[in-house]
């Protein structure tokens, strides 16, 4: 949001203080925002920027912001006891389920938080935990298993804040326990009261862009030590807790990275480059990315570009403004965390192909319009071209659908029925279904039964229609 405001208000004059929280996550937007704010600070001495994080690389950020003062706020965490496995676990999902059952059987009262990588794993684990504990009968207290992942409807996400179930036999019975099984959104985005035990398999899904085949993938990857510390900290919010790491202590110390790999190093940069061009930043080499070159490296780039060095043929075929991107191949080892040169090259090529940039790397008229849409460049170009083919309403619906998660619901106990319902749709049916469903909403106020019979998420269907279409 702040990046988009900067397009119309480059000095961010509406704000006197800007706070950036969870800076250690190094999201794509955060790294770009750091560069913009550093530039704004040179022009607005009244602006204050506060960078907050629980696991921040303080020295790196201080150096970036020219020796900014550092304030440490003492934490209020209770002690957390860490347990490691003796040997690596072959199947971390089964190990997590086994550990949860052991905690419920043997440990004092307190809720459990399990970190897994995605929806399918989480739903599978929920079913197995319920079944395993249910088979134990009255020997243990009741359990409430709650999933948490991004595509879960909001009302179901709120269940993580429910209390643990009461004992079966009144106050004298064995107390119940809540088990929350979540993706890494529970690391920092929210705090769940009552969590005493954390189970950490050491993995998370990360979006990775392959510039050679121009495809983004969600890959299961080891977490960083910083993320592991964050996960363990979830157990010590209200009282002393325990964290069960399903990997060896040696793996924690030797195999895990210190910090999470910055998103700018593994993302498609098409939207970022388009935004920077709209902000008037034409020289991407000199843009002060949070993860960019030191001053000496920039001087070397200037010397190279202004010298008479013989250039490779493929450089000569490129517009001169694109040469710096290829130079990054030579100076990458000297940089801190530079954006991948091939990824930037692909972003510039894509924007040029879509007509957003001309052959000299300048923003075109259609590129200016595209930058106004908070969409991937391909989708923005599709929206801009739709009036020419008189299909704007349909393109708006399709674009909305491509900008939110998968609409299809596939309950584990009804997978066959869900697959059969999905097979009845053609490509054109979903936009028509979305549009016609809103007619039913206006007439009957509810359409839950209709969409659920087709195994489509009602709340995601709501997101597919633009506000204008819902009025």
What do these predicted regions represent?
Residues 302, 307-314, 318-321, 327-329, ...:
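Acidic, serine/threonine- and proline-rich low-complexity intrinsically disordered segments
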Residues 1-382, 389:
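P-loop NTPase motor module signature
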